[in-house]
């Protein structure tokens, strides 16, 4: 077994490989009472060497340039320093972009003033403060699962003939200027400040998205007073920076209503996801955000296909089809839906949008990059025209039917091989015989049932979490009073598996 020495002792290949999280790298970056750090300075040095080896395999260039950035996490500065030091030691030229966003790091490979061979972002998205991670981009796009496997399994260090050159640069300003130019070009108003007269509040959740107020919205003329949590703070003291989190969405809702804003914008930590709140306080995330963006792309590209992840509403499918489009449900995971969209385009099926209910959204016109700020830019392009026509954002999805009841339950799997347990449960629920439960054949992830009487009218999906030891149950119903009966039947079924922790379920059905 290959071992390596470092400041913090020996690192085994197996330990490095355990940091792989599909097409990302994630780990514990800070010791806590419950966890011991495994994404350490030593680990990051090994990973940096792996990135260099991966690039050398792909690019076969005498000189490589890599851009490096981080979000607001407490461990970010130290890990960034280690990453940069190892890259320079290997002879790679490095742009240190400091605080940045994940989409901006990819764009550093496209902007001519940088032309990076790769962009490397230190982030763990919305996970707790003690996590961190690494996302890697080449000029072709985000690293795939097999690329990360190669990086983590090829960490042999090579000293460059000469040390690389380090340059500090302001990437976010370049990135923001690019967004501003696109919004101006596409806006209904032929003016430098098409958002004059609009009040737009931003909630950055103390992540990296605060730049959007000053460098994008204010430049376009918007009033951003009332924006909150713009200062980067890796303790995340106000709420989880996650547009898929109810507490976070309540926070931006309150800000919109309190400040009488025309729009509220919320980003996750590294700005690859976003959501909006309308003037009336309505939340546009999950199915509603997919519907808004679907209407936009279908107005620009009639008949296009739209790839989503699996836990989307039946009503969303009907909405997209009513606009002349086609929804393709696929496996959760932003790389999965993006790759499915790329596959469809290669097959000659025009597919303009790949999007998850979590807020990851990637447009064909924007390199199929999941970019939360670009999503907001697409919406901002519409605001002046909607105002001129006396319409609201909500009007874009007035025809989208909303379920009367929804519920999500996450069951912790307390088994060493939790994936095997989850797979077994999903395989065995196929044989369940309950009147009103019918397996939906149009599904690629977990198992999806259509519900009819005596269980109302709706659906539920049972699937494994992509990143955590969780079994996720999502239910929608168009009739009131049927969520609990479904949950009770699910409880009876899961009682056969003692390693499934049902503590999140019990309060939902107690005394009902």
Q: Model-found features: residue ranges?
A:
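An N-terminal, well-structured beta->alpha segment
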Residues: 6-83, 89-90, 165-200
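N-terminal small/polar loop signature for handling phosphorylated ligands or for N-terminal nucleophile
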Residues: 53, 65-131, 215-277
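A short, gly/pro- and small-residue-rich
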Residues: 129-153, 277-293, 366-377
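Gly/Ser/Thr-enriched, mixed-charge loops and adjacent short helices
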Residues: 113, 130-256
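Proline/glycine-rich low-complexity loops and linkers
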Residues: 97-98, 102, 152-183, 193, ...
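Phosphate-binding and adjacent anionic-ligand microenvironments
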Residues: 301-474, 479-512
């Amino acid at each position: 077994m290959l071992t390596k020495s470092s400041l913090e002792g020996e690192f085994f290949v197996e330990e490095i490989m355990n940091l792989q999280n599909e097409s990302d790298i994630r780990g514990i970056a800070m010791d806590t009472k419950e966890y011991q750090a495994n994404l350490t300075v030593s680990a990051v040095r090994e990973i940096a060497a792996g990135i260099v080896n991966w690039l050398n395999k792909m690019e076969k260039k005498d000189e490589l340039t890599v851009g490096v950035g981080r979000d607001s996490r407490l461990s970010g500065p130290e890990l960034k320093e280690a990453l940069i030091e190892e890259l320079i030691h290997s002879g790679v030229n490095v742009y240190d972009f400091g605080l940045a966003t994940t989409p901006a790091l990819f764009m550093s490979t496209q902007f001519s003033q940088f032309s990076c061979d790769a962009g490397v972002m230190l982030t763990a998205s919305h996970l707790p403060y003690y996590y961190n991670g690494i996302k890697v981009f080449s000029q072709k796009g985000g690293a795939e699962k097999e690329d990360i496997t190669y990086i983590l399994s090829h960490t042999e260090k090579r000293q460059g003939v000469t040390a690389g050159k380090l340059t500090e640069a302001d990437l976010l300003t370049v990135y923001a200027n690019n967004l501003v130019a696109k919004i101006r070009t596409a806006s209904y108003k032929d003016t430098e400040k098409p958002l004059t007269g609009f009040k737009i509040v931003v909630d950055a959740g103390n992540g990296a998205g605060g730049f959007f107020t000053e460098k994008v919205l204010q430049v376009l003329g918007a009033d951003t007073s009332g924006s909150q949590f713009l200062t980067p703070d890796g303790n995340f003291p106000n709420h989880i920076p996650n547009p898929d989190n109810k507490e976070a969405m309540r926070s931006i809702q309150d800000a919109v209503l309190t400040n009488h804003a025309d729009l509220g914008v919320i980003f996750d930590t590294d700005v690859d996801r976003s959501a909006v709140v309308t003037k009336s306080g309505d939340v546009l995330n999950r199915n509603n955000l997919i519907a808004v963006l679907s209407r936009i792309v279908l107005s620009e590209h009639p008949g296009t296909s739209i790839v989503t992840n699996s836990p989307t509403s039946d009503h969303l499918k009907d909405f997209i089809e009513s606009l002349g489009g086609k929804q393709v449900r696929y496996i959760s995971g932003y790389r999965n839906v993006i790759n499915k969209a790329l596959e469809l385009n290669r097959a000659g099926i025009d597919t303009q949008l790949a999007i998850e209910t979590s807020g990851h959204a990637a447009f064909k016109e924007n390199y199929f990059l999941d970019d939360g700020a670009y999503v907001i830019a697409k919406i901002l392009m519409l605001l002046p025209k909607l105002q001129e026509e006396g319409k609201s954002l909500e009007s874009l999805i007035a025809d989208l039917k909303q379920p009367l009841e929804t519920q999500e339950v996450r069951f912790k799997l307390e088994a060493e091989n939790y994936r095997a347990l989850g797979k077994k449960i999903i395989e065995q629920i196929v044989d369940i015989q309950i009147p009103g439960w019918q397996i939906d054949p149009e599904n690629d992830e977990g198992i999806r049932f259509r519900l009819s009487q005596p269980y109302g009218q709706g659906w539920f999906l049972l699937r494994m979490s992509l990143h955590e030891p969780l079994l996720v149950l999502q239910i929608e119903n168009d009739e009131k009073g049927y969520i609990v009966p479904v949950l009770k039947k699910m409880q009876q079924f899961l009682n056969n598996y003692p390693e499934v922790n049902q503590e999140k379920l019990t309060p939902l059905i107690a005394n009902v």
